[in-house]
Amino acid sequence: MKVKVIPVLEDNYMYLIIEEHTREAVAIDVAVAERLLEIAGREGVSLTMVLSTHHHWDHTRGNAELAHILPGLAVLGADERICALTRRLEHGEGLQFGAIHVRCLLTPGHTSGHMSYFLWEDDCPDSPALFSGDALSVAGCGWHLEDTAQQMYQSLAKTLGTLPPETKVFCGHEHTLSNLEFAQKVEPCNEHVQAKLSWAQERDDEDIPTVPSTLGEELMYNPFLRVTEDAVRAFTGQVAPAQVLEALCRERARFQPAVEPPQPQVRALLALQWGLLSTHQKK
């Protein structure tokens, strides 16, 4: 199983998962169809399926264009709001392409129809992979926008947190540096946070993705997976796990640094990349 990490938009990740024997491929969270097709063409693979983690535009805006270019393409997810959806998936459902298996894990919290995807390959020594969208990120998680903190706790602690610790975690955004800065505020004495933050700063300086992490690593430095730890409880002033999680989300929202609006030239470049502006002007 080969995973191509594809940075797009401002800080999103798309993924192309390749079955190296059959040359079949599955895409996850198609934000920019043209970029995905470019990578697929370069790899010489046949794209057979799109898996969307949730319906937000920055994870699905390329679905319709891709489905138009590739008639018969399966576009799958758990939420009817997903653009160009061809079939709705259920929690625990299994999919397969070649020797690669996919287990669909419903992880509500960020959105009510958020689905994460757990992949492994037959007779392969590589670690399994989790494509977690905005449910779980490196040292963080997505805001719970449509569900309760209890549902989000269930998703993080029970559904994802019990997967094998060697599982590689591929998330939907590059928010690692700010997530770790917040984690350091929550647990200033956590050596795992400090070490990961130093590593992430080096990656950021070199403009290198910080994905994947592993689930075992996340359990050591991600405060949203550490809601039963004394230091995290003390930071929030709460004891019950769901209440700790909700307090963390509130504090993380306050901690989010203010971002200066981009300059006009930068806005134009982003608009071109997002397909909101054409390079061909009418005369």
UniProtKB/Swiss-Prot annotation:
Family annotation (InterPro entries): Clx_II_MBL (IPR035680), HAGH_C (IPR032282), Hydroxyacylglutathione_Hdrlase (IPR017782), Metallo-B-lactamas (IPR001279), RibonucZ/Hydroxyglut_hydro (IPR036866)
Annotated GO MF terms: hydroxyacylglutathione hydrolase activity; metal ion binding
EC supergroup of this enzyme: hydrolase
Pfam families: HAGH_C (PF16123), Lactamase_B (PF00753)
Binding residues for Zn(2+) 1: H54, H56, H110, D134
Residues annotated as binding Zn(2+) 2: D58, H59, D134, H173
Cofactor(s) needed for function: Zn(2+)
UniProt keywords, alphabetically: Hydrolase, Metal-binding, Zinc
Keyword presence, Heme: no
Keyword set includes Chaperone: no
Entry's cofactor comment: Binds 2 Zn(2+) ions per subunit.
Family statement drawn from the similarity comment of this UniProt entry: Belongs to the metallo-beta-lactamase superfamily. Glyoxalase II family.
Protein name (record): Hydroxyacylglutathione hydrolase-like protein
